[in-house]
Amino acid sequence: MIALYKYAIKNGADYIFQTDSDGQTNPEEFAAFWQLRDKYDAVLGHRSVRGDGKSRAFVEHVVCFLLRCIFGVKVPDANAPYRLMKASLVDKYIDRLPEDFNIPNIMFTTYFAYYQERITFREISFKPRQGGVNSINIPRIIKIGWKAVGDFRKLKREM
């Protein structure tokens, strides 16, 4: 994902919109995000109701708890796959992340909140998966999570 963000920046994009391709988000909600683009540098989705199961919601709560403990930021949804960001804001933080960093959106949300950028969270609908195969299972989530804690601590020291 980092390479795609860099591609957009390199090619002069003013805004970067990111969403997943598995049909869980609603394209009709984009207009509300677009209307907020002049007021905020990033409009980030917030999934208070999730159609992807309790285990995924639990993982998101753990992530938000870790971000609060490690970075001192309180966000309602760190990794929502529906976000409209000014390319200049992404460019400001992207080089802080390793090229192969697995969860860049979580760190972008963290940086934006930590440095008090002009951001807002907007409720989005989040349906059960409509297509594709769930590539994340509990053992993989634990492995990613364990690595993330180490990565978060390292990135915090660099702030």
Where do the model's predicted regions map?
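Short His-centered aromatic/hydrophobic patch
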Residues: N105
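Catalytic donor-sugar/metal-binding loop of nucleotide-sugar-dependent glycosyltransferases
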Residues: D100, T109-K127
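Short, hydrophobic alpha-helical packing/hinge segments within bilobed ligand-binding/sensory domains
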Residues: P81, F108-T109
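C-terminal, non-catalytic tails of nucleotide-sugar-dependent glycosyltransferases
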Residues: K147-M159
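Acidic metal-phosphate-binding loop of nucleotide-sugar-dependent transferases
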Residues: G23-Q24
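Acceptor/aglycone-binding surface of glycosyltransferases and processive sugar-polymer synthases
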Residues: M1-K10, Y15, P27-N102, R129-P139, ...
